[in-house]
């Protein structure tokens, strides 16, 4: 007679409690891009680590809401919701009243390029819109269910606003690819006038800026199409470095193909990543690297969220940024700038 484990335990009087342990999420590749959330349309994905050591994701969803997702491992994402939308702004009606002609042309309000941060013990978000008004808001939670408006409508129009907190605690706004301006610690206003920054050799691009600091070097990322013309070629990420945030900055360098308006961020293990998304006609990475029509917008990113492993190193007293997936690492033959 066969004795099952259950019968054996009954006979011997041993009581055991079994727990089903979920399989550990497989670590993301450090040599190839990973595509996630394939059913979710998004642009401008932004990822930050919160004080609870969770990753938080937001992005443009083509509507007036700011979606927020959460993850412990960058692979498995839980949608927290879309609690914040532009209708929550105290000056939302002012926007509608002042942009009636633009609304006829563009339709209802749409929230563009949101970014969220945890700065000075509170959550902070910035975004722009299709109706010539940007916003900076604060909240006690990453969902931004309840918000404060430290600058209200006086924040004005900022093209793809982004924030950077320096090691000395100063907070800077980056926008317009690029202009920087210091913010007050409580976000109620600006300190000083805007400062224009430029690569030494050419224009950086037209949108999607970010500044990080590696050692004592400032690394400024910006976005442009490879042909330097809107929606011509591939949507790429470039960078320049400086010893001071105000510059002078180095020549423009190549960060990654099809990484335009991506977030450069460091994970909990100290690895660097860049977010990416579909912008243009999709073609496989192999097809893109064989060559693209320079007159058509083309992307090797599928719909959803793409995470591309990156290398950021200090070499010869400068910063070298490189995509570790070789499909993203080199500019295309159609690239206007020669690197």
PLM ranges: what are they?
Residues 1-7:
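Positively charged n-region of N-terminal signal peptides that target proteins for export
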Residues 8-19:
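Bacterial N-terminal signal peptides
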Residues 25-339:
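Carbohydrate-active catalytic/glycan-binding domains of CAZyme proteins
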């Amino acid at each position: 007679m066969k004795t099952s484990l259950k019968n054996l335990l009954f006979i011997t009087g041993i009581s055991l409690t079994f727990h089903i342990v979920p399989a550990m999420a497989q670590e993301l590749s450090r040599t190839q891009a990973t595509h996630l959330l394939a059913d979710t349309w998004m642009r401008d994905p932004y990822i930050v680590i919160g004080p609870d050591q969770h990753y938080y994701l937001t992005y443009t969803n083509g509507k007036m809401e700011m979606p927020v997702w959460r993850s412990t491992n960058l692979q498995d994402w839980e949608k927290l919701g879309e609690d914040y939308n532009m209708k929550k702004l105290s000056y939302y009606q002012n926007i509608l009243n002042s942009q009636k002609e633009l609304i006829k042309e563009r339709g209802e309000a749409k929230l563009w390029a949101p970014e969220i941060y945890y700065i000075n013990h509170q959550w902070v978000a910035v975004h722009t819109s299709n109706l010539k008004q940007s916003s900076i808001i604060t909240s006690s939670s990453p969902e931004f269910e309840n918000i404060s408006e430290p600058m209200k409508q006086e924040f004005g129009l900022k093209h793809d606003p982004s924030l950077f907190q320096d090691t000395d605690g100063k907070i800077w706004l980056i926008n317009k690819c690029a202009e920087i301006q210091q913010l007050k610690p409580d976000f109620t206003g600006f300190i000083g006038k805007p400062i224009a920054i430029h690569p030494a050799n050419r224009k950086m691009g037209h949108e999607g800026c970010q500044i990080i600091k590696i050692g004592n070097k400032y690394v400024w990322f910006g976005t442009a199409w490879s042909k330097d013309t809107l929606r011509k070629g591939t949507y790429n990420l470039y960078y320049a470095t400086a010893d001071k945030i105000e510059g002078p900055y180095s020549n423009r360098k190549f960060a990654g193909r099809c990484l335009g308006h991506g977030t450069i961020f460091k994970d909990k293990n100290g690895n660097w990543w860049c977010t990416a998304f579909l912008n243009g006609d999709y073609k496989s990475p192999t097809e893109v690297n064989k060559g693209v029509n320079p007159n058509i917008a083309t992307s090797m990113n599928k719909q959803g969220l793409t995470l591309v492993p990156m290398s950021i190193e200090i070499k010869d007293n400068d910063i070298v940024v490189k995509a570790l997936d070789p499909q993203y690492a080199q500019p295309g033959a159609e690239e206007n700038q020669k690197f």
